[in-house]
Amino acid sequence: MSSFDIFSPTASVSGKFFLEASAGTGKTFTIEQVVLRSLLEGSIEQTKNILVVTFTNAATNELKLRIQASLKQALSLFSQALSHPGTPLPPYISSSETKVKQLYMKIRNSLATLDEMNIFTIHGFCRFTLEQHFPWIQPIQPSSIFSEPQTIQQHILDYLRKNLWDTVLSPKQYAFLSYHHRATTQQTRHLIERLLQDYTSTPNLALSPLSITLQKLKAWVSRYQHLAPLSLEEMQAFSLRFKQSDLSIERELPAFVQQFETNPYSLDMLFFPGMVQKFQEENRNKKKLSAPASPLDPFFQDWIQLAHPFCQKEPIFHTLLKSVQQHLKTHCAQSYSHDESIATLESLLAHNDTVVSQLRKQFQLVLIDEFQDTDKRQWQIFSKLFASPDYSGSLFLIGDPKQSIYEWRNADLPTYLQAKHSFPKEAQLILDTNYRSTPELMQALNHLFSLPTPFLETPQNILYHPLHSKGSAEISYSEFSPIHFFSSEDIQEETLWISKTASYLRSAYSIPFGNMAVLVQDYPQALKLITHSTIPMAYCKEKRIFDRTESPYLLILLLEALLYPENQQKIQAILMSRLFQLSSTEIHQHLKTFSSLFFTLNRHLYHYSLLATFYKLMGENVLSQTIGETLLQTPLGDIIFQELEALCLYLDKTTENPHHKLLHLINILITGKYDEELSFSSQSNDENMIKITTVHSSKGLEYDVVFCSCLNKAKEKTPSVHMREMYVACTRAKKFLFIPFSPIEKRSLSTKKLSALANYANVTKHHSVPHLVETLTSSSPELFSSSFQPPESSLTPDRERLPQQTYFSLPHLPSRTIHSFSSTVENLHFSEPIQELSPSLLFPGGSLTGTLIHKLLESLAGNFAACFEEIFNKAQTLLKNTPLEGYESIIAEKICTVFSTTLPFSSGSFALRNVHPHNIRAEETFLLQEEGELWQGIVDLFFEHKDRFFIIDWKTSFLGDETSCYSPDQLHLYIQRQGLDRQERLYRKAAKRFLHQFNSLLQVEMAFVFIRGLDDKGNGFLQPGR
């Protein structure tokens, strides 16, 4: 393969090329420069004649920004060349004044029309082509009632409700599958949810038809029918020849014996999961190998071949999924998933030369990025369009087989290699200069990946091509070589080593924690590292809103109902969604009520934000509970709630016009283009935080220091996948690469699960990982080093020892006093000891009484409709063995009065028992800054009633014997004397600050309620400032 230099005058960007771009070789930079050079040299006329296809939506956005930046830089350069003729230009450009002016104008025009450039994912390109050239074939369009996911979900529900699965699964298989998808934990999902999420996937593991399985079963029964009736005792004795398994077979053995005797031709004969697991050949007890041969050996060996796939969860699910897909194709005419859109376009292009000719004419430059992740059908489309001799434009296929780690997304290496060898040798190019890693680290990586020969064993072997380094970083490798192996026997020791080494590198090399990464296989491994780490670490993973649930479609339905409340079809659509989950009967019975609700919400949307309207809707009661509660009780309901919040907030920021919000959201779904703001990411930009991420998520990223914990964890993968993931992990590093290994790990040919490092040792003919490490470090100590002890003890005396672990800490801020009313207000009555009973005061006073009654009121929050007996029982429980024991009856009576008495707030009078329990919050803490001072407060009661918000502060103060002692005038004097008017002002300010996050017009009222003196004459209640 020839080296490709985009700036070389002898290099060409006109023609068809296959470009291999190893990690760190500036692939994206090359793409943007190919676009720029093609524009400058005139091989393309306008930006709309450019087609770039890449892997993800995020990559399309990044590419467009990078190309835009490249064009701006070129525009600045040519502008400078016009005013300063001696300005150096790219070597492939003529420096004549006329030429420079023409190119300046072309770059300026290209920038102005950059939005016309076609940058797609493969699925986006297929949808675009189908819409433009085959308009009669469209994906499902959201109807006036259902969005696409809802339409699909309805058909899946019908499929399951009508038991259509019984043509592909046995009843026991379906029951087994349903059980494993019950939504009892965060790790399990309803079967419908998974079918809805995966209905576009390819069911590669689907089982043979039941008719074929039944034929094989009958042949097996005929072969072994002479063994009937089976002896349970012999079966139990036979089972002792095998090791203990996770699933018990105590109940299965008798059932198996009976099934074989009474109805062996039933498919139930194959469904004994515990026996399938138990009687696997690898589970044989080696101590029992000397036992005499048993006729049950061939009996069960043949049975296992039939029963094993029949009892596996994923093959059963894929079988069901395949049947559901066929059902959807029949009942959802012209419905195309991502994968189906590829297959459809491939089929249409095969028989439509006119469209092929139009596409070839439209696109003069085509760049296919991440080509190693392309599958056979995608290549059929691109080869038909642009690899053909009839295509006169330029084509670049850009990829790296060493980084093909997405086999689960149908990435197909044989297709990559087939495409590569369809190009002549002179058109097979390579980027062979690494701009990421230091020269020393690059030399070590070259050595490491040149040892396996070939690098990947495939039908056409893949070789590793060493790279030159132009990494700009300079580093002194005194303590560690560029690649350092460290020994760890468990995750705790590994984490401690990483923590200490990272701290040392930060101190000795001024490398921030934020420029370091730990690569893991999965989240459980990340969690263990975070748990044991002594320095700050964060797990970084990104999920896009549009990849997870149907929340965007739900929001479209909601916006349509909010904008058009007079349209009953749109109202019915949202009422049937998971937000409401109402049946058609319930909708018909309460349609007028719901219409009224959406007319009210329509006004709310125009006066306030979409987010505030969403929150108001979530708090509305429908039948027996709020809409928010209904949503949160559904599978993934909490995630959908968060996504709807994020979408509402994003649309509020984008435009104030409610109609534009709807159009903007629809446009996002159609084009697939959206801001990164609509991604849920835990990516941390904190320089004091080490990032933990998976190998797959790290692709395309780079860090100064990389700890490859992923290479030391055993996983059941093919040697090829292990090697590719190891390559991706190691090539993320710019300066240092650290690899943990187990000192006791040995090669085992019979072991299915290996770590990537153990696989590498196998491939390179080392008998163990320690042997591999010893070989590398002894043969090339300038490239590889190792530690077999913790860092401190492994250092020689003449070397600087690793510093003692320094724990991270936040900078010290000057201390500030936090004020509270319990600490600043002297209440003489509360400081008194327990008082004797007075004739009219039926229970003691003092601070302890206040605390106990507050606790009792807190326990009753949300239950203000409680009767006297219920309050009395609660009081007996809470006041037992306290100074108030014996006063439960009078205290319960007082509290009952508080709940039932009409409270005369300025906005309207009502009793607490009339407040909806879901609108109540008790003992809410806040921190507020007021005039340079920090105030902490605890709101006794915060609630909403009839769209108004209220605060109540309970008072148990003793002001006198009669309720007249608690008249408004007396309470005003008491409030002023105690400074409680300031408390009222601060509490209301804190509450308004909270509410204004959702609606800046919301107001709060506050009142003090004196438990001892409240009556129906207005005593015991005070609303300051009224």
Swiss-Prot record:
Domain UvrD-like helicase ATP-binding, first and last residues per copy: 1-438
Cofactor: Mg(2+)
Cofactor note: Binds 1 Mg(2+) ion per subunit.
Record flagged with keyword S-adenosyl-L-methionine: no
One MF annotation (Gene Ontology) recorded for this entry: exodeoxyribonuclease V activity
Binding site for Mg(2+): H854, D940, D953
Binding residue positions for ATP: A21, S22, A23, G24, T25, G26, K27, T28
Segments of this protein annotated with the region DNA-binding and helicase activity, interacts with RecC: 1-766
Catalytic activity entry: Exonucleolytic cleavage (in the presence of ATP) in either 5'- to 3'- or 3'- to 5'-direction to yield 5'-phosphooligonucleotides; Couples ATP hydrolysis with the unwinding of duplex DNA by translocating in the 3'-5' direction; ATP + H2O = ADP + phosphate + H(+)
Enzyme Commission code: 3.1.11.5, 5.6.2.4
GO BP field: double-strand break repair via homologous recombination; recombinational repair
Pfam families found in the cross-reference section: UvrD-helicase, UvrD_C
Positions of region (Nuclease activity, interacts with RecD and RecA): 815-1026
This protein's UniProt keywords: ATP-binding, DNA damage, DNA repair, DNA-binding, Exonuclease, Helicase, Hydrolase, Isomerase, Magnesium, Metal-binding, Nuclease, Nucleotide-binding
Gene3D superfamilies, sorted: 3.90.320.10, P-loop containing nucleotide triphosphate hydrolases, PCRA, domain 4, Recbcd, chain B, domain 2
PROSITE patterns membership: UVRD_HELICASE_ATP_BIND
GO cellular component, one term: exodeoxyribonuclease V complex
Active site: D953
Subunit structure as annotated in this protein's UniProt entry: Heterotrimer of RecB, RecC and RecD. All subunits contribute to DNA-binding. Interacts with RecA.
Extra remark: In the RecBCD complex, RecB has a slow 3'-5' helicase, an exonuclease activity and loads RecA onto ssDNA, RecD has a fast 5'-3' helicase activity, while RecC stimulates the ATPase and processivity of the RecB helicase and contributes to recognition of the Chi site.
Family: Belongs to the helicase family. UvrD subfamily.
Record's comment describing the protein's domains: The N-terminal DNA-binding domain is a ssDNA-dependent ATPase and has ATP-dependent 3'-5' helicase function. This domain interacts with RecC.
Job description of the protein: A helicase/nuclease that prepares dsDNA breaks (DSB) for recombinational DNA repair. Binds to DSBs and unwinds DNA via a highly rapid and processive ATP-dependent bidirectional helicase activity. Unwinds dsDNA until it encounters a Chi (crossover hotspot instigator) sequence from the 3' direction. Cuts ssDNA a few nucleotides 3' to the Chi site. The properties and activities of the enzyme are changed at Chi. The Chi-altered holoenzyme produces a long 3'-ssDNA overhang and facilitates RecA-binding to the ssDNA for homologous DNA recombination and repair.
The protein, known as: RecBCD enzyme subunit RecB
Naturally occurring in which organism (per UniProt): Chlamydia trachomatis serovar D (strain ATCC VR-885 / DSM 19411 / UW-3/Cx)
